[in-house]
């Protein structure tokens, strides 16, 4: 019989993993809400952000010392955003008038391109992620001892989600995003700068992926060329579970998956099924509620 401390540790771990999934899932759901595109390259953006951090800190540590971590954090955020916007301009924008399948194939192509470039550069080997000492320190919460990272991750995620919701609900750009998500063609006819809205959507999604990358790889300690695939897929499932196109839905779906997955992993008899559970959940949700928990039914134009 397990005690309270055992279940509390699992719950905290589940909230941490769920928060990391949420930061990625928001990128999926925002891009889909605006472009009706499943950006399958998003998980690999997360992976690339990890390698950016590794390379920048390695390059700058010889002349900046401990300051290389701060420089690495800032440049990782900036360069990941730049990469995200470049991918949209090169791989997605030229295909806006093409059949929807073309966008999806392009996204899959970008995903494999990033994985193969990373594999070529690293030889397919995992690279150690820079140690951020402040995040690794442990703190006591009553009878429970956890790393600061486990407390910071959910708090930072909630703060970022609240800020994002406020931007979407109460700013001119947020209003433009909602208009484009509601009716792309009408928004364009009304004079809304579609390209600007789409670019900002990719900026937000890429920025959140970079933040998630920093937290996730600080948590597991290493980056490999294919490591973005599974978190990316699980975050996509979370977005569908909550109702793709809904930011709150993506967050709630992420926490449900993160907590359930952690409980399954904690049981040695069924831990091998932790990944299978996520995708089984997707099948069940699509059968029972195809639009997810908070998704709206969309009418396709013909």
Pin down the residues of each PLM region:
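Membrane-interfacial amphipathic/re-entrant helices at transmembrane-helix boundaries
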Residues: 1-24, 52, 63-71, 98-102, ...
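Membrane-embedded helix boundary and interhelical linker motif in transport proteins
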Residues: 12, 34-37, 41-86, 90, ...
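Helix-loop-helix "hairpin" substructures at the membrane interface of multi-pass membrane proteins
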Residues: 17, 145-223, 247-252
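Transmembrane alpha-helical segments in multi-pass inner-membrane proteins
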Residues: 23, 68-77, 202-209, 219-280
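Short, non-helical or kinked segments that cap or interrupt transmembrane helices
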Residues: 28-51, 97-102, 173-176, 194, ...
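Short loop segments and helix-boundary regions at transmembrane helix junctions
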Residues: 33-41, 82-125, 167-174, 179, ...
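Alpha-helical transmembrane segments within multi-pass membrane transporters and channels
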Residues: 63-110, 252-257, 289
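Transmembrane helix-bundle core of multi-pass membrane transporters
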Residues: 94-95, 100-170, 197-200, 263-276, ...
